[in-house]
């Protein structure tokens, strides 16, 4: 037996090719740019031909790797340096957004080019979104005309869903806001967006990314008021956006009022303090009394754990509401407020089945406590009620309404005799 180790064969002199997947391709955006610009130069300004060229080139060129360069070219005509400037020594093309005509129709046509490209190569979605976010941060480096074109294009792309409204975060950049660039850009953007859709669709998109309550941040802190926002955008021809923001602020103020009101009630704060607070909030946020009485009613009804037994809940409700009558009475100084309260009571009793038999008792209690008066009660009975539980509640109120009518007639005849 040979104990010597057998010599293993050597592979000297052999050359091996690296597997393709192991090769690191050099990152060369300049070469990619030259290929795209050459192709765009050949297609000219025919955007149909541009879209076809981009579609075909995706099979030969690495769009995934050079997405940023691709979108720089299509928007600005070439690769952008930090700050948004085009390098002087680089190739550039006039077949781009910034070199096109400054009108909505042209930007709509360019939007179609982007739509087709991203539909064809879905992986470009993220790169495009990132590219637009970057372009928005570079706004100061662009001319006013270039900013206007980009704003119109972005508005159209937001409307057709190619872009997500989260890209608007870039507009809250401190320097852009401070110099008024963000607000001016937003005017053009929202005009084209609302032109494609309506304000409700715009609002839904903003809500989806929690941007609906941030629009005032387009202005510096010392100008972040509803008054300044509505004046600026109304004068720019965007009254619907101004009204939307005003409504958003009102809704926010109402929610805050209800939250604070419930906390004050649970603490057992004196009614005079609660009334004072609510009246200050009404004045500060321009909330009308009929709206406030609805908030007060909801707050009052949410402060108690109701009995599940129908025969006991009416008694519990009367006892509870008797206690809160002075608070409710403070916000039914107008006929419309009383009518609103009646409708709120009707809806509540219908939605909470244990309260179905308590409706008339609540109304009578409020009449005696001077929360409600005969005029609004009679109007509610005649034609101002809603459909919810209508037949049940009208039947409950029949005798009381007859008594009110008789009392009213007696008062009128007494007044005539006095004359």
From Swiss-Prot:
Domain W2, first and last residues per copy: 247-414
Residues the record lists as N-acetylmethionine modifications: 1
Family designation: Belongs to the BZW family.
Organism: Pongo abelii (Sumatran orangutan)
Identification of the protein by name: eIF5-mimic protein 2
Recorded name of the encoding gene: BZW1
SUPFAM superfamilies listed in its UniProt record: ARM repeat
Role, per record: Translation initiation regulator which represses repeat-associated non-AUG (RAN) initiated translation probably by acting as a competitive inhibitor of eukaryotic translation initiation factor 5 (EIF5) function. Enhances histone H4 gene transcription but does not seem to bind DNA directly.
GO CC entries: cytoplasm; membrane
Database matches in SMART domains: eIF5C (SM00515)
Residues in coiled coil: none
CDD domains: W2_eIF5C_like
Biological process per Gene Ontology, one example term: regulation of translational initiation
Region (Disordered): 1-26
PANTHER family documented for this protein: BASIC LEUCINE ZIPPER AND W2 DOMAIN-CONTAINING PROTEIN, EIF5-MIMIC PROTEIN 2
Pfam name, any one: HEAT_5MP1_2
Keywords: Acetylation, Activator, Isopeptide bond, Phosphoprotein, Transcription, Transcription regulation, Translation regulation, Ubl conjugation
InterPro entries per record: ARM-type_fold, eIF5-mimic_regulator, W2_BZW1/2, W2_domain
Crosslink position(s): Glycyl lysine isopeptide (Lys-Gly) (interchain with G-Cter in SUMO2): 368
Positions with biased composition (Polar residues): 1-15
Chain segments annotated as transmembrane: none
Residues annotated with Phosphoserine modification: 12, 411, 413
């Amino acid at each position: 037996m040979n104990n010597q180790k057998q010599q293993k064969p050597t592979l000297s002199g052999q050359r091996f090719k690296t597997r393709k997947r192991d090769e690191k391709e050099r990152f060369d955006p300049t070469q990619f740019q030259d290929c795209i610009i050459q192709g765009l130069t050949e297609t000219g300004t025919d955007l149909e031909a541009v879209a076809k060229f981009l579609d075909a080139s995706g099979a030969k060129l690495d769009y995934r790797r050079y997405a940023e360069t691709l979108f720089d070219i299509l928007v600005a005509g070439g690769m952008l340096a930090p700050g948004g400037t085009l390098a002087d020594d680089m190739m550039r093309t006039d077949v781009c957004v910034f070199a096109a005509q400054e009108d909505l129709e042209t930007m709509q046509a360019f939007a179609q080019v982007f739509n087709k490209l991203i539909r064809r190569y879905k992986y470009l979605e993220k790169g495009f979104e990132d590219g637009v976010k970057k372009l928005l941060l570079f706004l100061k480096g662009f001319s006013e005309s270039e900013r206007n074109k980009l704003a119109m294009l972005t508005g159209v792309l937001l409307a057709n869903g190619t872009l997500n409204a989260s890209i608007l975060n870039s507009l809250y950049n401190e320097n852009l806001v401070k110099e008024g660039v963000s607000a001016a850009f937003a005017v053009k953007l929202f005009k084209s967006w609302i032109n494609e859709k309506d304000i409700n669709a715009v609002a839904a998109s903003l809500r989806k990314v929690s941007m609906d309550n941030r629009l005032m941040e387009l202005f510096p802190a010392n100008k972040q008021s509803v008054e300044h926002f509505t004046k600026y955008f109304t004068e720019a021809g965007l009254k619907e956006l101004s009204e939307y923001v005003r409504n958003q602020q009102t809704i926010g103020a109402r929610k805050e009022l209800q939250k604070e009101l419930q906390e004050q009630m649970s603490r057992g704060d004196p009614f005079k303090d609660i009334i004072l607070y609510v009246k200050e909030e009404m004045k500060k946020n321009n909330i009308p009394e009929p709206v406030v009485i609805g908030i007060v009613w909801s707050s009052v009804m949410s402060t108690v754990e109701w009995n599940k037994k129908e025969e006991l809940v009416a008694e519990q409700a009367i006892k509870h509401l008797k206690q809160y009558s002075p608070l409710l009475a403070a916000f039914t100084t107008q006929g419309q407020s009383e009518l609103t309260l009646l409708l709120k009571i009707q809806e509540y009793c219908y939605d909470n089945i244990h309260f179905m038999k308590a409706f008339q008792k609540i109304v009578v209690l409020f009449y005696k406590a001077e929360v409600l008066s005969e005029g609004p009660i009679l109007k509610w009975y005649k034609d101002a009620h809603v459909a919810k539980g209508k037949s049940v509640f009208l039947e409950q109120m029949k005798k009381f309404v007859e008594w009110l009518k008789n009392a009213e007639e007696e008062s009128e005849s007494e007044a005539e005799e006095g004359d």
